[in-house]
């Protein structure tokens, strides 16, 4: 997205229609932009500062967050049933999606860390201790993930 402008012919900015005299310019959607002119249509953030990816839909140029907010899909957390915004990081277990804070054993509330084993029983996530206790009491065998 960021380019060094070669000496010689200056490019015109697609945002303000003025010549780009700066050493650096942005190229997006086959057009050239001043760094200050390529902004998200919703939040006005400078897209050159927030990453190398921009999103476009319905003639709007958007940052990732606003694109997902406007056009992304949302769902509900399998643990708390509250809405999960499309831009939020999540944890997944099979077809279930969880807020990061909700990804914990649903019996003892122990939060899982990277690499921890968890078990799925009747769409409930369980830690190894609660799974083994339940296995001994009830004889159930959820799947290890």
Swiss-Prot record:
GO terms for biological process: negative regulation of transcription by RNA polymerase II; positive regulation of transcription by RNA polymerase II; regulation of T cell homeostatic proliferation. Keywords: LIM domain, Metal-binding, Repeat, Transcription, Transcription regulation, Zinc. One of its GO terms (molecular function) is DNA-binding transcription factor binding. Residues 11-73, 75-137 form the LIM zinc-binding domain. Induction: By dopamine. The keyword Chloroplast does not apply. GO terms for cellular component: nucleus. This is LIM domain only protein 3. It comes from Rattus norvegicus (Rat).
């Amino acid at each position: 997205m960021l380019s060094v402008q070669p000496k010689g012919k200056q490019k015109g900015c697609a945002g303000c229609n003025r010549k780009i005299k700066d050493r650096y310019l942005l190229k997006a959607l086959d057009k050239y932009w001043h760094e200050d002119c390529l902004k998200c249509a919703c939040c006005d953030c400078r897209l050159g500062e927030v990453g190398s990816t921009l999103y476009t839909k319905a003639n709007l140029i958007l940052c990732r967050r606003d694109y997902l907010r406007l056009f992304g899909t949302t769902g509900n957390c399998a643990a708390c049933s509250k809405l999960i915004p499309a831009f939020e990081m999540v944890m997944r277990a099979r077809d279930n999606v969880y807020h990061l804070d909700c990804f914990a054993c649903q019996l003892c509330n122990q939060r899982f860390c990277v690499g921890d084993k968890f078990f799925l029983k009747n769409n409930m996530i369980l830690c190894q201790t609660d799974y083994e206790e339940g296995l001994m009491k009830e004889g159930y065998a959820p799947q290890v993930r």
